[in-house]
Every structure is written in structure tokens, then in C-alpha cells.
Amino acid sequence: MFTPQRNRWPETDRKGKAIAFSDEIITPPPQRVLLREDDDWQKFKEVGLLDEASLERKDRDALIEKILKLEKELFDYQHNMGLLLIEKKQWTSTNNELQQAYDEAMEMLKREKTSNAITLNEADKREENLRKALIDEKQFVAELENDLKYWQREHSVVKSTSEAKLEEANALVIGMKEKALEVDRERAIAEEKFSVMNRKSSELERKLKEVETREKVHQREHLSLVTEREAHEAVFYKQREDLQEWEKKLTLEEDRLSEVKRSINHREERVMENERTIEKKEKILENLQQKISVAKSELTEKEESIKIKLNDISLKEKDFEAMKAKVDIKEKELHEFEENLIEREQMEIGKLLDDQKAVLDSRRREFEMELEQMRRSLDEELEGKKAEIEQLQVEISHKEEKLAKREAALEKKEEGVKKKEKDLDARLKTVKEKEKALKAEEKKLHMENERLLEDKECLRKLKDEIEEIGTETTKQESRIREEHESLRITKEERVEFLRLQSELKQQIDKVKQEEELLLKEREELKQDKERFEKEWEALDKKRANITREQNEVAEENEKLRNLQISEKHRLKREEMTSRDNLKRELDGVKMQKESFEADMEDLEMQKRNLDMEFQRQEEAGERDFNERARTYEKRSQEELDNINYTKKLAQREMEEMQYEKLALEREREQISVRKKLLKEQEAEMHKDITELDVLRSSLKEKRKEFICERERFLVFLEKLKSCSSCGEITENFVLSDLRLPDVEDGDKRFGKQKLKAEEALNISPSAENSKRTSLLGKIASKLLSISPIGKTDKVTDLGITVKLPESSQPDDSLDRVSGEDHEPSATEQSFTDSRIQEGPEGSLQSEMKSDKPRRGRGRGRGRGKSVRGRSQATKAVSRDSKPSDGETPRKRQREQTSRITESEQAAGDSDEGVDSITTGGRRKKRQIAVPVSQTPGQTRYQLRRHRNVGTEEDKAQASKGATEKQERVNDDIRKVPSPKETRTPPEGENRENGKAEVLVETVTHEEIVTVETETVFKVNNTGKNPVEDPQLEVGGSGEIREHGEEDDENISMIEEENEGEEEEETERQGNDASIGKKIWVFFTT
């Protein structure tokens, strides 16, 4: 309980959270009576409860530190709020952009669906007309169907396995640290394997050089086949009319297919962009979750710190209460001590007075008895004086009793005041509103204290009066003594009187000394009381300060609790908002995924429809399909076994994940390199467009010259009619076939083609980075390249021959797809002139394709191919070998007829081919299987994603080759020759002046690449006479190329040795046997 608050306690100094006390106030040392309380006073000094300045200073420092900490926390919260608002704005903007992109994608999908429905209806109408063309295409389509199904199955399996792997990877992340050393070792092993792969690439280059030597051997053999080709060219003229009709239909189909390809490419690009944005969002969501977890951890730490502070405050409060209890106990002890002192004073004063009275009475009686006889008069006076003295003593005793009563009343009042103080303390703790009443009571107590002080002053005055009475008694005694001296007394009486006087003096001195001692003790007690009252007032002040601090601490605690509650609510709101945003974004992502899956399902439905159409025409190729299905089933079973085995081995899967990460990094580097190449290719495409403009202007002039050449050719035909051997062939010509199309029609078609090229430049090349785009591009390009109708659209009749760089010729000879079986002669010049605009574009596409470094693309990553690749290769050879063995004699006849007239009409071809290259340049191989309506970024500039990026030296060689090619094209401008000079030279001249370039057909256990040969003769730089191999039927080279790319990931050294042995066998048989026999030998091996 507290004492009354007379004055507030002084504030104590604080150091941090604890309370430190100083001992600056020097209390006066207690007297003899308070020696036992010395320890208590020393404890007060040590604790520092009496130091006001230090307590105030420490409280201020502690409060300032708290305020600074709270301000810092507020600034941090404000900063975090600002960051969260900025992030929210960014997310809203990104969400709007994604919504816009999604709406655009849905609109495009609707448009594409309608266009696809229209194209399907038209395709149903033209189904009867296209059955003949689809006989050669259905084999490739069947393989593509199997590929698509296989990829779909692989996609589903990969999805399931990827999900399982992700779950297992999340479980195995904990053990990643332990496996870091093993990963480093495996890196070293991978580097060793990389060195081995480099060594193998050097071996492949050596083998490519050997292939070049084989090409030379096949060129020599090709000269022997020229005569056979002339016989086949006659059959070609009969098919010309059918091809013209097919061409008109296929041009429309090609345009529509090109539009479908572009739409598919756009769609796939958007899908890839959506996937990338989804990945970025997932990363951002992970970062946000990490930030939220960090903020939660910080909040938990702050809560713990606040709890610690509250615990410290509670401990301090307990210590303060204990100190209060000690102070109350000491106050009670002091009150008891004061009461004991007062009682002792009263007892001693009473005893002294009684003793003095008794002594004085006895002595006075004796003195009176002795003096009665001598001095009766004096006795009477003395008795009167004694009576007066007794009255005075009675009055003094009455006054002392009154003083004792007053002191008892004051003590009672003090006890009542203490009780009131206790009540007030209880009321202060319970009710704050009663502070005013307590202040009023405190004023009353102050008044009562003042009254007590006034009573004490009255007691002092009474004591002064007692002293005055004592002085008067001494004076009266002196008077009595004088009167006694005045009396005549005998000597004995004088002696006795003197003795009595001395005794009285001694007794009076003793009484005075005792009174002085009592006065001194009273003064000391008064001083002690004053000191105690001062200390009590100081304690009251400190108590008031402590109560004020407690109130402030309670307010601060309430504020902190309110802040905590508000911050918790705010964090909960932010968490709710962030969760809502995350849910919305996840819903958006799910919607995008669902839309993407719906798009894929639509594409799959379209593919299934196409599959149903193509399955009607699969009766002829069931055997090949069954064999390949068996091989695919075996391979799928093996892969399923491998997958089950890999599931059991979690460590290997983690290693594969790491290797995949490295591969992704390499792919990123490849993508950066490809972007640079695409920029260069865009610049080249702009240059090509300008060149096409120049070519268009030059072709107008050349058509006029070609009309003159046509007239010369007609004169030449009239001369040949007289010949017995050539008359029948020349009679089949129709003059209407040699009509040239109008120049305006050519200009219009050239303008359309130019617009297509410009649109191709604006399409972003990111779609070529995905495997899906490459597959779709392969499907479209091969459908056009394999069909016999599309073969008439090639621009090889222009005679553009540009020699490839030496570094890329072997690769092109192995990788390039042979897309045509014949070389159109000059008699079908009217047919080729209608499409003469498409020639430069195709030539430039073949140039860019030949300039790409492809070393290690089909064979660099490993000669070991899977069973699936082998079966496809062998089937392609079987298809190629059938027409060479005589199953398609009609084609052979056509090639012979075309070969007869080709040498006769070479002048027109050479003239037109030379003029078509306005920029000049060296001649190159004939364009092979390059459709005019190509999708941008597919095969024209070789924008397809490479499996392995070439070194910097290969890139430098490729760029150098491109620049050299451009310089050669700018320097070569040829003259118009006469028809006579274009005849086929003899065999010796062909070997000396001409150049025979042969694409070698190589057959291994893994793949078969059939290549079309072509001989280009130069006669005094005035013309060329291309001669084509009639026995090479091209139907599956594109398939083998693609399957080679798909299956070149499995490396086996055993199959590499088998391939080397088979190449040696081809070299042995190359000089003796024909191409058909070689194919049969390779097929049997």
C-alpha cells in the first residue's frame, strides 16, 4: 500500500531496459538510537530511489529509444506497403496485357476454325482429283501419322513422368547438397565425352571427304546414264498436259496450305510465348511467396521482441511492488520507533519529576522543621512560596498531560491518515477518475500536517515557558538564599545551610543536565522527523513518477497492442489480397492452359480427320506400315522398360535433370546465336527482294528476246521434221503450248510473291525454336516436295547454277532432299514462264540452305540410330528401288523423251538461266524440292533449330561463304548463245569443260539418304545442259532425313563400324554395277 502523495517522486535514470540507481543524495547519519537502521539507509543509497535526476534522464533515454525504434518500424512498413502497391500495379498491367493477348488468340482461333472448315470442305470436293497425286504421298503420310501418334504417346508419357519426376525432385532436393561432389565428377566425365565427340566429329569430316571422292566416281557413272535419260524424256511430253491441269489446282492448294502453315506457326509462337509468360509468372509467384515468408518471419521476430519487452516490464513492475512493500515495512518500523521514543520520553520525564518532587519535599520539610523555630515568619513565606511552586508544578504536569494527550491524538490522526493513504492507493489502482478526490484529500492531509506543525510549535512554546518558570524558580531560590544570608545564623547553621545549598546546587545541576540531554534528544528527534518527512515527500514524488511511468507504460503497451492488432489485420488483409491475386492469376493460367489444350485438341481433331482421309488410301502400304508398327512397338516397349528402370533409380534422374539444365543453357546460347543469324538473314531477305525487283524488270526484256529464240526454235523444229528419227517426236509438239503468258499476268503474280516475302520478314522467328513448329513445317514441305504435281513448280528450268562452298557441299549432298525426277525441257517453256517469278526466290532459298553449316546435324551426334530409323530407311530404299527395277516404265519413257529434247532446246534454257541471275555469280547445283509457297522461316533460310550449334570457326566460314557467293553472283553475266552451240558435247568435253556433281546414295543400318545427281556442262561459258539420272526415284529421302534427326540421339560404336563396312562395299561395287543394282545390294545387306 502507498503512503499519501505529498510530492511526486523524482524520475530515475534508465540504461536501456533495466533501471539503474545512483547514490548522489547524501542522507545525514543517524544518531545513537538509529544505528541499527544504518543498513536500510545504505540500501536506499545503493538502489538509488532517492536520485530524481538520474531516474528522469534514464526514463527519457529509454522513451527516446522506443520512439526511434517505433519510427523505424513505421518507415519499414510504409516502404513495404509502397513496394506492394507498385507490384500490384505491375501485376494488374500484366494481367490486362495477358487478357488482351488471350482475346486476340481466341479471335484468331475462331477465324482459323472457320478457314479450316472451309478448306476441309474444299478438300473433300477435290478428293477425287487428288487421289492420283496422293498415291506417292500416302506412304509419307502414314509415317507421319505414326510419328504424330508416337509423339502424342510420348507427350502423355513425358507429362506423367515429368509430374512424377517433379514430385520426386522436390523430395530429393534435400539430398542435392550431398550429391554435389558426384555431380562435379560427372561433369569431368561429360567433358571427356565432349572431347570424344569432337574427335568423332573430326572422323566424320574425314569420312565426308571420302564421300566427296565417291561423288566423283558416281559422276563418271552418271555420264553413262545420259543416253537412257534421253529415252525417258519422250514420255515426259505426254504427261505435260496433265501436269498443267494439276499445276493450276495445286497452286491454289499450295497457297491455302501456306496460309494454314502461317496460321499454325503464329499459333505455335503464341503458345510458346504463353508458356514463357507462365513460367515467368511462376517464378515471380515463388519470389512473392519467399518475400511473404520473410515478412512473416520478421513479424514473428518482432512479436517475440515485444513479448520479451512486456515480460521485462512485468518483471520491473514486480520489482517495483517489492520495493514498495519494503518501503512500507520500513515506514511502519519508523512509526513504531517514534512511538517508543515518545513513550520513553514521557516515562523518563515523569520519573525525574517524581524523584525531584520527592527529594524537594523531604528536604523542604526537614528545612522547615529546622527553621520553624528560628524563623516562623520565613516559614510562612516559604510555605506560601512552596504552595505557589506546587501550583506551578501542577500546572506544568497538567500541561504535560495535555501535550501527551495531543501527541496521542496526533498519532491516532497519523494512523487514520495512513489508513486513508492505503484506501487512496487502492482507489488509485482501481479507479483513475478518483484522482481529483485524492488530490483534495492530499490537500486536507497537508492542512493536517500544518496543524501538527503548529501543535509542535505550541509544544515548543510550552517548553519555553517551562524553562522560564525554571529560571524564575532559580531566581526565587537566589532570593531565598539572599534572605537566608541576610538572616543571622549561627556557624553550624551556616555550615549546614551551605552544605544543603551545595547539595541543592548539585541536584539542580543534575536536573539541568538531564533537561539539556532531553532537549538535545528532542531536537535530534525533531531533526530525524524532518529528515524522514523530507525523505517521505521524496518517496511520494518518486511514487507519483513511478505511477505516471506505469500509466505511460500501460498506454504504450496498449498502443503496441493496438499496433500489433492493426498490423495483424493489415497483414491478414494483404495476405488475403495476395492470395486472391494469386488465385486469380492461377485461374488465368489454368484458363490459358485449358485454352491451349483446347487448341491442341482442335489440332489433334484436324489431324485425326486428315488421318481418316489418308487411312482410306493406305491399302497399298499396309506391309510397310505393319513392319514399322512392329518396330515402333518394340521401341516403345524398350522405352517403357527404360522408363520403369529410370523410375527406380532416383539418383540417375537427378543427374539427368542436371544435364538437362546444362542443355537448356546451351540451347539459350544457341538461341542467342540464332537470333543474330536471323537478323543477318532478314537483311539478306531485304536484299533478295530488291534483287527480285531488278529481276522482274530484266525478265520483261528477256521475254522479248525469248520470243525471238522461240521463233528460231520453231524453225529448228521444222528442220527436224524432215529427219526420220526425230520427226515423230517433233510432230507431237503443239504451237499453243509454246505461248508465253502475258507480261501483266507475270507482274501481278510477282507482286503477290513479293508481298508474301515481305510478310515472311515480319514474322518473328521464335517459332522455329520449338520442335512442334519444325514437325509441322516438315509435314507441309514434304507433302509438297514429294507430290509429282508440285515437281513442275520448281524453277530449275531457269538454269541458275551457283557452286556451293566446299565446306558445305558434302553436308548438302547428304542432307538435301531430292524433290524431282525430271528436268523440264524448252518445249514446256510456256509452262515455266508463267511461274518465272518464283525462280529467284527458290534459288536464293537453296543458296541460304546450302550456306548453313550442317556438319554433325544428321550424323555428328552419333551414327547409332534406333530400330525405328532403320526400318524407315529400308522402306525408303525399297520404294526407291521399285521404279528403277521396272515397276514404273511410264516415268522412264517420259524422262527419255525429255532427255531427247533437252539437248536440243538448251539454248533457250541457258539464255533464260543466265539472264535470270542479274547480279551474277558462279553456277550452283539445281534447286531440289523447294516449294515456292514456303512458310517464312522454314527451309528458305534454314531457320530450323539445329541440334548442335557449330563452332565459331564454322560460323565464320559460313558467313565468309555467303559473302563470297554474293560477290560471285554480282560478277557473272552471260551472253545469249545460239541453238547450235547448246548441243550435248561429247563425253570427253564433258569431262574436261563440264562439272558433274553427284549426291551419293548411302545406305546403313541406321538411315538411307537418296540423292539426285545432276551434271552441268559449260561450253565456252555460253550455256548449260543439265542431265539427270533417270533411275533415282526420290520418295523417301525427306522422311529419312527427318527420322535421322529424330533418332540421332542414341550413340553406338558398333553401328558406326557396320556403317563403315557398308560404305566400303559401296565403293567396291560403285565402278561395276548400276545405281539400281547398288540399291538392291544395300537393301539386302
Swiss-Prot record:
Residues 801-997, 1020-1077 are annotated as: Disordered. Residues 932-941 have a biased composition (Polar residues). Expressed at low levels in roots, leaves, flowers and flower stalks. There is a cross-link at K318, K661 (Glycyl lysine isopeptide (Lys-Gly) (interchain with G-Cter in ubiquitin)). Residues 1045-1066 have a biased composition (Acidic residues). One of its GO terms (cellular component) is nucleoplasm. Keywords: Coiled coil, Cytoplasm, Isopeptide bond, Membrane, Nucleus, Phosphoprotein, Ubl conjugation. It comes from the Eukaryota. Residues 51-149, 185-695 form a coiled coil. The modification Phosphoserine is found at S764, S787, S825, S843, S910. It is a peripheral membrane protein. InterPro entries: CRWN. It is found in: Nucleus membrane; Nucleus, Nucleoplasm; Cytoplasm; Nucleus lamina. Residues 854-868 have a biased composition (Basic residues). GO terms for biological process: nucleus organization. A motif (Nuclear localization signal) lies at residues 404-411. Its main location: nucleus. Belongs to the CRWN family. Component of SUN-protein-containing multivariate complexes also called LINC complexes which link the nucleoskeleton and cytoskeleton by providing versatile outer nuclear membrane attachment sites for cytoskeletal filaments. Required for nucleus structure organization (e.g. size and shape). Core component of the LINC complex which is composed of inner nuclear membrane SUN domain-containing proteins coupled to outer nuclear membrane WIP proteins, the nucleoskeletal CRWN/LINC proteins, and, possibly, KAKU4. PANTHER family: PROTEIN CROWDED NUCLEI 3 (PTHR31908:SF9), PROTEIN CROWDED NUCLEI 4 (PTHR31908). This is Protein CROWDED NUCLEI 3. It comes from Arabidopsis thaliana.
